[in-house]
């Protein structure tokens, strides 16, 4: 069976699962102090690229790729191009991509959120872009602190994010199922997607 056919068959189940999921009224776990108690990505919130608060519970029932991005990195073109391609081919199957700009690595994302949004538009980005954040240190966004300590979110040689375009694969229940290093291109994730749709 082709992946496209599988996606069409599973789409109604994904939508029903998202609507029937328990705990939709739960409180967000977005503070700097209580992130350790979270059980899924869906308990967090983040500001989108336009500064609006987004409850990540909206991704319940979807498979997500969460990545830190930068516009002036040597890996920018290949990552943006492949992420746009993955999103175009699998969004209908239930894939969502969450891109978090970050300036912590070589100061390669120096622009404002508006400038980053304009840059991403040059790649015809249709996936969700968030406001610029830190992914390491005390000021790291709580979601990123949480993802790094999950059993399948830990890194090689420590849990810190090593560079731009570290990617986390998150299942429909909001659990981290795999971490991909910055040198792994997004197309590598494609082989893992069918298990989680």
Swiss-Prot record:
One of its GO terms (biological process) is protein polymerization. Keywords: Cytoplasm, Developmental protein, Lipid metabolism, Mitochondrion, Oxidoreductase, Peroxidase, Phosphoprotein, Selenocysteine, Transit peptide. One of its GO terms (cellular component) is mitochondrion. Gene3D superfamilies: Glutaredoxin. It catalyses: a hydroperoxy polyunsaturated fatty acid + 2 glutathione = a hydroxy polyunsaturated fatty acid + glutathione disulfide + H2O; 2 glutathione + H2O2 = glutathione disulfide + 2 H2O; tert-butyl hydroperoxide + 2 glutathione = tert-butanol + glutathione disulfide + H2O; cumene hydroperoxide + 2 glutathione = 2-phenylpropan-2-ol + glutathione disulfide + H2O. SUPFAM superfamilies: Thioredoxin-like (SSF52833). Signal peptide: none annotated. The keyword Phosphoprotein applies. It comes from the Eukaryota. Its EC number is 1.11.1.12, 1.11.1.9. It is an enzyme of class 1 (oxidoreductase). One of its GO terms (molecular function) is identical protein binding. The modification Phosphoserine is found at residue 40. The active site is at 73. Expressed in testis. Also expressed in liver, lung, kidney and spinal cord. Monomer. Has a tendency to form higher mass oligomers. Interacts with FUNDC1; this interaction promotes GPX4 recruitment into mitochondria through TOM/TIM complex where it is degraded by mitophagy. Essential antioxidant peroxidase that directly reduces phospholipid hydroperoxide even if they are incorporated in membranes and lipoproteins. Can also reduce fatty acid hydroperoxide, cholesterol hydroperoxide and thymine hydroperoxide. Plays a key role in protecting cells from oxidative damage by preventing membrane lipid peroxidation. Required to prevent cells from ferroptosis, a non-apoptotic cell death resulting from an iron-dependent accumulation of lipid reactive oxygen species. Belongs to the glutathione peroxidase family. This is Phospholipid hydroperoxide glutathione peroxidase. It comes from Callithrix jacchus (White-tufted-ear marmoset). The lineage of its organism: Eukaryota, Metazoa, Chordata, Craniata, Vertebrata. The gene is GPX4.
């Amino acid at each position: 069976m082709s992946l496209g056919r599988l996606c069409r068959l599973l789409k109604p189940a994904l939508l029903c699962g998202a609507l029937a999921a328990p705990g939709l009224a739960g409180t967000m776990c977005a503070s700097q102090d209580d992130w350790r108690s979270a059980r899924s990505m869906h308990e967090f919130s983040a500001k989108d690229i336009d500064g609006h608060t987004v409850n990540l519970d909206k991704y319940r029932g979807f498979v997500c790729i969460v990545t830190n991005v930068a516009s002036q990195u040597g890996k920018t073109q290949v990552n943006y191009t492949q992420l746009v391609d993955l999103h175009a081919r699998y969004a209908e199957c239930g894939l969502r991509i969450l891109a978090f700009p970050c300036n912590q690595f070589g100061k390669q994302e120096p622009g404002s959120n508006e400038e980053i949004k304009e840059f991403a538009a040059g790649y015809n980005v249709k996936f969700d872009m968030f406001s610029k954040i830190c992914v390491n240190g005390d000021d790291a966004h709580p979601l990123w602190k949480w993802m790094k300590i999950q059993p399948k979110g830990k890194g090689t040689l420590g849990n810190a994010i090593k560079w731009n375009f570290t990617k986390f694969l998150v299942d429909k229940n909001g659990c981290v199922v795999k971490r991909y290093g910055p040198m792994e291109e997004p197309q590598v994730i494609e082989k893992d997607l069918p298990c989680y749709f």
